[in-house]
Amino acid sequence: MKRIITRHEKFEEKEVNLHEALFSNANGYIGIRGNVEEGVPEDWNTMRGTYINGVYEIIPMKQAESLCNLIEKKQTMLNVADTQTICLKADGERFDLTKGNILENERILDMEQGITKRHVIWASPSGKEIELSVTRMTSFLIPSLFTIEYNVKALNFDGDIEIESYHIADVKNYSNPDDPRLGDDSGALLKVEVVKWREDMSVAVSKTSVSEIVVASAVSHRLRLPGKAEISYGKEEGRTLYHVKAGVKAGEELSLIKYSTFSDSVREEDPEEFARTTLKDAMRGNLADIYKKQKEYVEEFFANSEMEIDGDEELGQAVNFNMYELFQSAPRDKYCSIAAKGLSGEGYEGHYFWDTEMYVAPFFILTNPELAKKILQYRYGILDKARENAALLGHKKGALYPWRTITGEECSGYFPSGTAAYHINGAIAYTILQYFFTTGDKDFMLEQGEEMLLETARLWLDVGNYDRKGRFVINEVTGPDEYTCMTDNNYYTNCCAAYNMSMAVAFAEEHSSNKKLKELLKKLEITSKELKEIKEAAEKMYLPYDEELGINPQDDSFLQKPVWDLKATPKEEFPLLLHYHPLHLYRYQVCKQADTVLSYFLFEDKQSKEVMKKSYEYYEKITTHDSSLSTCVFSIVASRLGMHKKAVEYFGDSIKLDLLNTHNNTKDGVHTANMGGCYMAIVNGFAGLRINKEGISVDPFMPEGWKKYSFKIKYRGSLLKFTVTKSGAICEVLKGEAPDVKGIKEMRNEK
């Protein structure tokens, strides 16, 4: 199956905005929105953007009342220099898709090559026809490099072709004051310090005012044309201009290759020098070689993560799209992680949430554990900040990771649905353990992983207490469901806390004679008495259960509230968060997303199948799925409970969320968590893959209409391919040793 997605574009505002996100280019370091090079009408609400992962400015966070330790500042991802703008004229007429006639207009995402393409045939108002072919790439091998190959052909006229290629340093972030999921208008966050030509290379250097981060970019061009051209180098305030004018005959083509490099002071001592040197090095070769290496890199990615669905090619394409977008978003160094929108847009201001560990990291743990390790190393890098965050909230010991952040400091201005969501600690702890169980990487655990487990475990011990019945309880926290905040004993949170605490102690006990472990306990000043207290709290954790309904209440007060009538709620009032005051939502039984249901995926041994099924059916009736993190979880748990038809239906709701723009906000950036959740819906849901301390197992079923499906994972150094047919699962060992996999009908060794 070809991994290529083609869209025929009408060039309407809503569709263009969507395609800016879907056809973005990224490599984990830089991300460039799939904007139309020539621009769009000024009155269109478009988000033109280029981003560097982990690069930010600090801006004020206004609080209505200055209460103790509420945050007063936050970080926001920067929109950096625009190097994608190119304007075109055909014999004096400006190329403008809102004028003349569009004869052909398509966008292509070629996941096999690691590029995007744009193909347009346009007739000017006077009838001159132009064929425009554009190829764009962010290099995986040269992370700071972005290229545009801009080919213009005159189809039915002899005349002049003019190209104006811009390097614009004077840029602003996008804002929308009516949507809390986007940033507010903070004005220009970058102060332009340098814009200049150094021979034929354009260089721009900007600096933030508060974080004092320097961002540099360099641009240069190569030109291919049939004859001679007039070339000039211009400079305006905050930008440079490369101008080409060439005479062509009908059928002749002019080709411009635009090379851009980016750098920042988070990573480099001299960003300008790095950008210039990297650009020179990239241009010493030819673009064809860079394309070739890009293709090989992407081929290796799919070779290790390949997933095939026999029986639904369109669905298979959507799966490939999701995996590729995650790959584009993945960090390649310790300075950053994966934002809620990846690098495809400014939704949620480029912040990292619990989504990264709970929904996205599992994909990389199974297919590219080195990238998964980078995600966890980022969390280790901000562990001291998490300790400071815990202290700000009054905790004597331990670490509390911020709800949303870039640098490690809390960026959530609304603490009831932000900072109070202590379960982010549980997500990070769970992912550390999944990484360890899957890879067996004991060195990571001893050097970084166990320290995070112990510090998050300490936090739970401090935030909780024993009630009069001797149960360990956790009060005033918020679970995954953001329509229910500041509650006592959120079932999901308590499960996370118990697991975090018990596994932190278990690892310490199992490696008690290890020198590094002893040094760690000494460094953290953790005594055997404290370890015993942590273990006991985990064992005595209170998990709410309602005898009358036979379900796990989401929290202690949830079942006391009236039930929200979702059927009577008009469609235009969803998502509820944009139409109802938070307090109004908090007073009802209504869920934004999977909460207790998510716990049944992660901690399925805590309850009987009967309790989980009753709870699932109860919460299903009151969950809006306003969050993109929801339907994939309902699919996974439905698979676990044997409700296969329902599992497939929820998966169908999840898999094309971005491609079909079902939440109407993909224009702000793709939903990386949902993409990871879709992967889990197949691997952990349909195939029933489980990896834990005891080993690896599957419990598969075949969705109706599918003939078979397969996927590859890495487990303990081995590359395995699972193929599920109607008769069961086959495991093939492609590299390494054959593990003991429970639940398969056959093991094959293809080495």
What would you call each of these model-derived segments?
Residues 344-352, 399-438, 442-447, 455-535, ...:
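The feature captures the catalytic groove of carbohydrate-active enzymes
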Residues 72-131, 609-613, 620, 637-751:
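Non-catalytic C-terminal accessory modules of carbohydrate-active enzymes
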Residues 17-51, 359, 407-408, 420-421, ...:
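C-terminal capping/lid segments that line or modulate ligand- or cofactor-binding pockets
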Residues 330-344, 370-430, 436, 443-445, ...:
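Helix-terminus loop motifs that line ligand-binding clefts
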Residues 309-316, 331-334, 366-376, 436-451, ...:
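Structural helix-adjacent loops and short alpha-helical linkers that scaffold large soluble proteins
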Residues 352-381, 447, 509, 523-667:
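Active-site core of glycosidic bond-cleaving carbohydrate-active enzymes
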Residues 85, 94-100, 304-306, 312-320, ...:
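Carboxylate/His-rich catalytic cores and anion/metal-binding grooves
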